[in-house]
């Protein structure tokens, strides 16, 4: 992320990674259970600063999405536009002494997914749904929004019914 966004987050303002019971183990025992134990950072101050870069990248992305929406509004085409944003994985950021997208812990599997557009397509603005959604649901959702048939061979399910509830 550009330096401007990195400077929004200071290491002092960030919480320590959640370790659970791992802090009670000796380092060699923790490392043997840690994903990427050979390549994961071991410097505690560096580990503490990792979230700043991650949060900076998210804030930068959020700003870019805002610019896109502003341009769509300015061009008067937002009323005919659907935006679906999703990430394929999260980041462990040192939680449970893990990094990247190693295991099915919350930091790795809980990712943003939002659908924005005219209410006639996506339902009431500001609706938050906490139901489980999967990446395989994205394609049938976009097909339904486009008015196209969803092939029977598709594993996913459109999220529109979920959002409409």
Give the label of every model feature segment:
Residues 1-132, 145-153:
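Active-site-proximal cap/lid insertion segments
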Residues 154-165:
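Short, intrinsically disordered, charge-balanced linker/junction segments flanking boundaries
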């Amino acid at each position: 992320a550009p330096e401007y966004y990195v400077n929004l987050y200071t290491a002092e303002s960030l919480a320590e990674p959640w370790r659970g019971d791992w802090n009670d183990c000796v380092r060699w025992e923790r490392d043997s259970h840690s994903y990427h134990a050979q390549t994961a950072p071991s410097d505690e101050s560096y580990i503490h600063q990792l979230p700043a870069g991650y949060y900076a990248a998210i804030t930068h992305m959020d700003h870019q999405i805002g610019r896109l929406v502003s341009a769509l509004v300015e061009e008067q085409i937002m009323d005919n536009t659907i935006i679906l944003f999703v990430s394929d994985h999260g980041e462990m950021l040192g939680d449970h002494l893990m990094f990247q997208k190693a295991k099915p812990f919350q930091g790795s599997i809980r990712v943003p997914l939002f659908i924005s557009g005219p209410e006639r397509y996506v339902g009431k603005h500001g609706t938050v749904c906490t139901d489980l959604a999967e990446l395989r649901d994205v394609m049938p959702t976009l097909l339904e929004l486009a008015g196209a048939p969803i092939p029977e061979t598709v594993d996913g399910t459109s999220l529109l019914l979920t959002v409409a509830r």
